[in-house]
């Protein structure tokens, strides 16, 4: 849920990148940190394990200027994708205004993607979020690799709500900014309705 500070005229929103381990969530944030104007982005904070997998979260603060006289700030988080970090994912997901679900497009990762997607849906339900009204974006990552599933298959198994979806190659930035832009715009539209 967005934090609104009336005294400072600030709105802080939270976007969470969610998906299986090594699907490209942290790579998205690294690309954005390099691509965004330095005056609009803060320092990236990562808590990694020795294998460079995210242990708790990555955080990237992003300022977008003013809307209706309020300074808009987005905090971009990733969750650890490894199965044993479910409680951490739940903690990071709390208060999210938008989720970008990053799916690994490799055929060998379909079942893991489905399990992660099902877990996300369950957690959103437990948080009383209506998936039909909640800002959600699907990102089909690693489109540059061999043995990837057609987008139509990913859509069939993972995009049952027909939310916006993007093909991406996070290591090169393909689709990363477009995906975030839709997440931000969806979040701002929802804020205007509240």
Functional labels for PLM-detected ranges:
Residues 144-194:
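Canonical P-loop GTPase G-domain recognition
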Residues 8, 52-55, 65-70, 90-95, ...:
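Conserved catalytic network of the ASCE P-loop NTPase/AAA+ motor domain
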Residues 86-107:
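Inter-motif core of Ras-like GTPase G domains
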Residues 105-161:
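Conserved C-terminal guanine-recognition region of P-loop GTPase G domains, centered on the G4
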Residues 22, 82, 106-108, 142-146, ...:
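Conserved nucleotide-binding/hydrolysis micro-motifs of P-loop NTPases
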Residues 45-84:
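Switch I (G2) and immediately adjacent beta-strands of P-loop GTPase domains
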Residues 2-49:
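Conserved G1/Walker A P-loop phosphate-binding module
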Residues 1-2, 32, 59-63, 117-125:
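Short, well-ordered amphipathic alpha-helices
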